[in-house]
């Protein structure tokens, strides 16, 4: 591997030799064990003897030890030596984990996986594993492909971010000194490199300067932050004394976008105080280094650094760290981060001022409480650096201004106070400088112009700290680590086991003892450490000791994590308390905690610094701080400054700020997918290679490493979904994989077979509801089994292929053998005959015989005539078929007209139904008014309720007496009060969020109170009564609270008293709830009264607008009808004009059906076919040009021969022979051209038929568009009906409200009525939303139809061009015929007797051909007319589409109006809910009169019974009214039947998709193989193309050589020409013949050159053809993308149809109010859906073609996988929330049941305790009443939370169902993908065939080229012979008359010799 050459590879993975060496160690699983050792942790040993539970072991050191068996731990086999993932260990125990880490650390393999996280051990030295080459090794690799490394985890986070579209976080945790900071820097560098943005174009920069990129700036933040935030501690030389969360933002393509930093818990105290062995922050020592010697002078640092107290209290240098080099890096980082020189200098000046300020000294004035400066040198230097006056600075420190009353005075400070003020200012100043640095870095890293879609957060925060002296800072650092550890535990352990519970597998919940909630609550909960610290900060005269004593009193002995500190040992400081953290027990000292928490600052000093003139940075950092004087001035001016001191409130402690930032951090982490890096300290000595076993084991335990591995081993870490499992492992059990449609059952069958075969055991796996779970390593075992099975199958497959190839090779060899035998026989015969004289004579005579050649030519002409006759017969047949199809179209048109007529009748029926609905609505209004009258009769019953209140009040008085008797017993439970109070406070904290919501509702209530003021005047009398009831209720609530408190304390001691109390409290609670509910509902209805009246007017006005819109739509319908009549007339005209095109149409229909069946295989071949047609047309054009050139050449030759005929008969005979041969060649070329023309004509016919089919589809789309438009109109009318119905219902509601002013007893019935109205409103809103979606669907379809119309227009234009091209070809063919006719006539002059008959026959056939051509031309003309008509139809269709678009836009505007109405109703509903809540709170205060009714209990019972009877009677009346209104509901069943039919038709539409999805499950296993085959095929094609290119290159070279030879021959010809000219001068009589001969030779040479160029052009065209084949693949992929988009549109259309179906079901409920209308609408919907169904069936071919688009579907599959993962994560999170809500609701139920039981039990005891209760005093009664009120409020809060919990539970359930549905959809998409892959394989095969055909075509062209080359050589030889004959003729020109026969014989001999040579060469 290339990786192994990297120098860092040896520190990442062992070599094979090392692995073999480690695995060859001796091992016995029964004897080799680990035993505990106090020094090494564990030692290896071997068992020698066993006796009972004792074993004797010989250690590796040779010692013999006897131990108990339980202390011995198993040893893993050598196979797992130095394993990279410790979860793979067979024996998982502490000893094995420690040994694995120790052995890897000894080999400097510092990274090791531990289950799901990574463990890294600090190597304490530099390793070459973080170089750029190492980083590149891990980029884009899976985590399992590479060795453990920080980069592997980082790359996994990066890929998860891009694939899952989820933010990621990397939590690098561990103790201080473990290497967190270094790993953080490496992670940041890696992400900067991966998402590098340097290649992006940016602004022009100076070419002499290096461009600073964003990744450089991100990396350079580390030196700056480390200089100001890192310091040396006892355990770490570069310890981060602050926490940071670095968010690196990326766009959706993974490109680096920006970065920002958030920091936490900066240790400010370090700047003024350092512990022994530690150092202040690095920046101070860097400034004092010699990197910039002049800097110290500028900063006035003239003393040794050891003399500056603030930075020199301990260490000054660090071993191994060069401050000069570090300062250089810091200064350069400032420049890269765009810090200006002034900003840098100001920052350094502030650091220098800090050092100077630490050296300022003060002394106490004698006998005064006033401090004064003891020397001003350092103060002057500090003031100089600050840019302020020295005297002003010192005065502000020693005499700060404070406010006394209303005046500001100077307050004297003693030395201690001044020193405190100096330290506080130093800490505050440094903290603000650090904040400024972080903000400046964030500003620089905030890049503009790149989207920030996702981020990866890297958390580096101070590790857990246990020092000798632990103070306020250590408490917060340890608290943060505690929270992070709990986050890790919850993510790693709880969620894992909850996954098992959700899947329903057999699993016992394991408690791994890592719940850190107790420690966290001890710190942050009420009465916790932080809460008590904040409380002490506001208590006067509070000190650190009072805080410590309160903490001890509150928690010692009561909380398991709070302990008394042990006495200090060694250097340990004194401690006030100890706390047990997850990492150990820490001793804390409370010294200065109050001051650190309050963090006070000297406002006078701050004011002076804000006036600085020499340091702009100082002014900037204090700009947001408001001093007391400034706040007072703003208060006087009305500025509202108050007393804020630069904080977020009037008093914000440091703890509050820390807690807020920590909560934000945890919230952010919970929204990301975490990746954990656990850093381990190997030893305390910072020595490389040494492991401190006890220290490492403690960290492993605290970090949860061992528990993580254990749960990973005990659980099932590997899992896969049922469909995925079945698809991948179906090869192991093919029969079982297809046994059932349920994938879970298939998975169970597969696993059962594997268990029966012995491949697996039942303990290795579990089958859940949706997934199969595996133990660690089982999945790898299954993969091995699968690979073996695949190897077996592939071996058999390969053997079959080899057998088949062998047979083919044998057949080829046999055919080759037969051909060779024939060739050999012919060669032998020729060798025998060539010396035979008769054969020689035959060879000379045969070429002179013309009869045979003429017969062959006549036969060829006869064949052509027959072919033309056949083509005419086919044309006649096509014409007849087109006529038949035209008749069918006429019938279809008539049926469409009948449908339009039915639509008109339906419109009139709809108007009648509207009138009926209005009448029904009036009747309903009357019935509701009667109900209102009945409700008004119940007003008198309110008085009965008041009497019931008095009776309950008497019972409360009895309870008071019993309470006095219980006082003595309650005192005994006083010791339990504190714990109960703690619980109450915790509940109060939980209720704070509810209180905030209540506060918001109160604000809304105030707004509503202004509106309801008039109504409240009418209710003033009721409010007076309510006030009186409030007073009584307050007393009773206090009583109940006291009862609750007393019963809580008495619960353990006296159970009998608890039971009595529960009974009483339950009864009181029930009565109170009844009163509260009645009051709330009464007030709610009163408030709604006014609103409903105003809303009624607005709804009525909207109804009028909608009616106007209905009339407008009716007018549009009439216009559409007139347009339909016009279209009918046009269609009638079109029917007459299409009679001649019927034949082509039937052919096209048949081809369309065939194409519909084959579209899955051909995919996007249409575009490729168009390209092939274009290529063939180009080839045909070239052939035509060649033919024309050949004709011209031959005509020239014939002209020359005619001139020579009179002068030299022999020369003419020779030329005629040559012309005959050339003519034969041209005849062949012409025949080929004619065949190509016929093919093109056939293609033209096909394209014409396709065009006609497309026109038919366009007409169908127009019909569909009109149908959809009518459907949209009908839906608009429905929406109007719904709106009018809604208005009427609202008016009815207003009438009801006016009748219910004082009807409190009937609130429940009115509430139900209100809920019905709300549900109707929701139904109307949902219906409107569905209408909007349908309109959007219509608009999308219209756009699609318009796009298809444009495509049809383009195809029509192409067809017209093709027709014109064919016409040109026919004209050229006609011209060729005329030329041949003239030529034959000329040749007939030579032999008139022999050729006269043939000429007559040819003339007759030519006339017949001419007639056929005329007929074809007339047919083309008719087709052209048809095309023109179709073009007009297409334009009309486009106009209709535009009109439909306009209608759709109008519908969209209408929908927006409806949406606004719905939004108004939604707002009003929210207002009503707010009013209801406000009324509930008001009416709680009006129910206190309940307990005055002492003597009315029996009357109350009677009244309640009467109310119940009345309620029953009213319910019965409402039921009767509902039955009356529902008389129209009988048609619902008819609607359901219609809807079922519609659903069946939609199922037919989805049939093709379902088949593809079913086939996908069985074919998914072919995906990987298909991809491999595709890559192989591509590589083979590329190789073959490369070979062809080489062949073509060789051919070009050969052509070049041939060209050179031709040029040489041309030169020789030129020489010959010169010689002939000289001869011409000598032979003046023969000059004309010589010129003609020379011209002929020149033309022959030119022809040869032309032929050569033409052949070269053909070779180039062949090469272009091969390149075009390559481009075809790219075009096909683009077609895949386009088709996939269309598939997405169709899918959305499918989903919208499903939504429409659901809308139809919801419309059934609405049909109760409009039964008659629903029946007609259902009929209309049936007609519309049937038309849509027919349209969808016609589009099935297009849908099937879309299935072949693979590449985009692969992207969809990946996206589906990502959504599936995200959905699973969401489901997991929702399940967690669901569990929490369930637990909370169960807890509330238990509390409620307990309270009810207590009230029931205490009722029995109250009577007995009545007499004793009188002995108590008024104070106890008041206390108990107060307690009753508190408990009642808590009870109300618990009820609200219980209701909220139920709501959240329902929402979570819905979310889980939605996610499950999404997962199912993703599965279906994946199944559909497999079908597409198979189709792509078929397409690849066709492309292979096309490539082979191209190769064959190239070979044929090469052969043709060779033949033409031979012919050219023959022509040159004949030219030579012609020149010889001419020379002979010139020599004998003056001879006697007998010379002519001599010339003739010599010419004949030449003619005989030339063909002989030609034939010999051809033979």
From Swiss-Prot:
InterPro entries in the cross-refs: Kinesin_motor_dom_sf (IPR036961), Myosin_head_motor_dom-like (IPR001609), Myosin_N (IPR004009), Myosin_S1_N (IPR008989), Myosin_tail (IPR002928), P-loop_NTPase (IPR027417), XRCC4-like_C (IPR014751)
Composition bias type Basic and acidic residues, residue spans: 970-988, 1133-1146, 1322-1336
Region annotation Hinge: where it falls in the sequence: 1162-1173
Modified residues (N6,N6,N6-trimethyllysine): 125
Domain of life of the organism encoding this protein: Eukaryota
Annotated stretches, region: Disordered: 970-990, 1125-1146, 1317-1336, 1912-1963
One Pfam family hit: Myosin_N
Start and end residues of each stretch annotated as Actin-binding: 662-684, 766-780
PANTHER family in UniProt: HOLOCENTRIC CHROMOSOME BINDING PROTEIN-RELATED (PTHR45615:SF58), MYOSIN HEAVY CHAIN, NON-MUSCLE (PTHR45615)
Record's protein name: Myosin-4
